[in-house]
From Swiss-Prot:
The gene is ZIP3. It is a multi-pass membrane protein. It comes from Oryza sativa subsp. japonica. Coiled coil: none annotated. This is Zinc transporter 3. Keywords: Cell membrane, Glycoprotein, Ion transport, Membrane, Signal, Transmembrane, Transmembrane helix, Transport, Zinc, Zinc transport. It is found in: Cell membrane. Residues 66-76, 141-213, 263-271, 325-343 are cytoplasmic. Induction: By zinc deficiency in shoots. Expressed in vascular bundles of stems. Its main location: membrane. PANTHER family: ZINC TRANSPORTER 1 (PTHR11040:SF181), ZINC/IRON TRANSPORTER (PTHR11040).
């Protein structure tokens, strides 16, 4: 009787375990439950237009806004916009992309050795490697820009006056090299450009150029993955909530990237190219997903590995850029530190950006 009672107690747990195991097995199959290719195609076309418009609007807000006095790169409102954008980018890396990378690389659908041992956290390793690599690229690129600027900035030599024989020529040479103005004497030496006040602004411009280019690289990588995943789906129930969520996602990321582009002071042509690349990447990814949807199996081992590795690398890049190149730089700015009101506004914008982007993870 006791054994029978014990069996009855254990039976529900066995049924739950069997149900969970079956669900896991089904997740790895390329099922077509809820598939509606025609309905999904309509939603994909809407997604292409919506995400394209949202991304373009986001990146153009800071670019167009720099012509307005309130949104100048050195203005208080722009500080708040940058803090908001940095929060968005940080949440994108930590809340959206990195968890997805861990899910992909620890999926039960992947064949791995080692029995029941815990799988190695490859997502964390790839993310860390990408962050360190970003730091190396950041440093090397900044060094390259500095060296190129130094080669362009040649010191201006003073007029060399050679001393010739004769007291008159010596006195004349001394007169050229030294002038007396109102009781003080100064002599003219070489004009060294690196000691000029413009050096700081040149260094800042170099840093912003590097930051914006590396940041765009990280954003482009995961935008392609997002687009392909959406384009390859054949379930309208999966696509429908993603349309709005990814539109907001692209808009907020565009604001962050646009702010960096504005600070870098790129030429008009470079600014337009970077804005177009960002705006088109996710829609192009959707088109690629549509093209391969008939043969692409999102539940295959290859798909999990590729998606996991690229998401991990993208997360590492975005987390590094948001913390080191955006937040640390701006929040250590003396202008921010001596202005309590601006500090509070920047912190509020940071938490608002990170919070809103994190909320989107409910739907995306």
């Amino acid at each position: 009787m006791g054994a029978k009672k014990h069996t009855l107690q254990v039976l529900p747990w066995l049924l739950l375990f069997a149900q969970h195991t079956a669900a896991s097995a089904c997740d790895c199959a390329n099922t077509t439950d809820g598939a509606d290719r025609q309905g999904a195609m309509k939603l994909k076309l809407i997604a292409i237009a919506s995400i394209l418009a949202a991304g373009a609007a986001g990146v153009l807000v800071p670019v167009i806004g720099r012509s307005m006095a309130a949104l100048r790169p050195d203005g208080d409102i722009f500080f708040a916009v940058k803090a908001f954008a940095a929060g968005v980018i940080l949440a994108t890396g930590m809340v959206h992309i990195l968890p997805a990378a861990f899910d992909a690389l620890t999926s039960p659908c992947l064949k791995r050795g080692g029995g029941d041992r815990n799988p190695f956290p490859f997502a964390g390793l790839v993310s860390m490697s990408a962050a360190v690599s970003t730091m190396v690229v950041d440093s090397l690129a900044a060094g390259y820009y500095h060296r190129s600027q130094f080669r362009k900035a040649r010191p201006v030599d003073n007029i060399n006056v050679h001393k010739h024989a004769g007291d008159e020529r010596a006195e004349h040479a001394q007169h050229i090299n030294a002038h007396t103005h109102g009781g003080h004497t100064h002599s003219h030496g070489d004009i060294v450009v690196c000691g000029s006040p413009e050096e700081g602004s040149v260094a800042e411009s170099i840093r912003h150029k590097v930051v914006s280019q590396v940041l765009e690289l990280g954003i482009l990588v995961h935008s392609v993955i997002i687009g392909v995943s959406l384009g390859a789906s054949v379930r309208p129930s999966t696509i429908r909530p993603l349309v709005g969520a990814l539109s907001f996602h692209q808009f907020f990321e565009g604001v962050g990237l646009g702010g960096c582009i504005v600070q870098a002071n790129f030429k008009v042509r470079a600014t337009v190219i970077m804005a177009i690349f960002f705006s088109l990447t996710a829609p192009v990814g959707i088109v690629l997903g549509i093209a391969i949807s008939s043969s692409y199996n999102v539940h295959s081992s290859t798909a999990f590995v590729v998606e996991g590795v690229f998401n991990s690398a993208s997360a590492g890049i975005l987390i590094y850029m948001s913390l080191v190149d955006l937040l640390a730089t701006d929040f250590n700015n003396p202008k921010l530190q001596i202005n309590t009101k601006l500090q509070l506004m920047a912190y509020l914008a940071l938490f608002l950006g990170a919070g809103l982007m994190s909320m989107l993870a409910i739907w995306a």
